[in-house]
Amino acid sequence: MLGKLARQHDPNVLVGFDHADDAGVYQLGPGSALVQTVDFFTPVVDDPYTFGQIAATNSLSDVYAMGGKPLTALALVCFPEKGDLEILERILAGGLSKMIEAGCTIIGGHSIRDDETKFGYAVTGLIDPGKVLRNGGAQPGDRLLLTKSLGTGVISTAIKKGLAKQSWIDAAVSSMTTLNKIAADVITAGHVETTGHVRTGASTVQTERSSVVTGQRPNSDDAFPVHAMTDITGFGLIGHVREMALASDNVSVRLYSSRVPLLEGALESVRAGHIPGGLTANREFAECAVRYEDGIAEEIKTVLFDPQTAGGLLISVASESVGELKRMLTSAGVPAVEMGEVLPRAGDLIKVSS
């Protein structure tokens, strides 16, 4: 809807809402810019403390996806007028625990009365304007890495129905409460960018990425070129891959469905019909951009559209560096999986193979 409004023109806005990036970026001065994002939603689990942790993890994710460091947060609370305040206290405590882990300070917030509980944060981070990672810039030959398994949407739906196995719940909660901080730290500390193309509005511009996005160790043996990055959240894997492809210059993407990591219980939830409304909407919107290889199971197709809460990072990295990046992430405890590649644009935007 914001796209329908008259545009404001401010030269300090480095990243706005033109291209579905994960957060906005506003330059303060040489070497300093703010990263800003906001997210809040209804409970996806029964335990209030865990819900608070998940909400905080999800709210912080967009700052990490841009390569930023979270600094401050404002809590956003919708809560029933006659609700049990001890429940709200537990939600806030859960959120605080993750903000402390992230090194992000809660400096206030706002609450309103609402029949349905909702919770999240507006998060402000800091970033070097020359080190912003965007969802555009993927180049033919790049490999795609994913740092978390899919399935939180369908499993959360099973949880709401009281039909999720405890092992499914445990796996989903572990994923949804794991910050993308470590993965982002590895990427921002060890990458160097090369010249690339990013779409801006209706035009395509060439950017000298070595000056726009440079790592801290550009001349070291362990430097690697990350051309684009985003986190997998409400639009599902296909939706965010679509955004990355459209934001890049004349590329398409091939996903290898057998390599896409899935949470325990994800396929079982799909087969049992635990389909969230967001998944259906994602599929209706984006499936026109997808061509499936023969033999892809229906439940696999479905889970590729599953809306994720606090999902992992999707990273487009040069092929010659993907092995080193995987090694660094794995050494840091991040289970990065290579599950796709970027191709020159020809025909369908997204191709799904087995």
PLM regions: where:
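Helix-biased detector of long, well-ordered alpha-helical tracts
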Residues: M1-T200, T204-R209, T214-S354
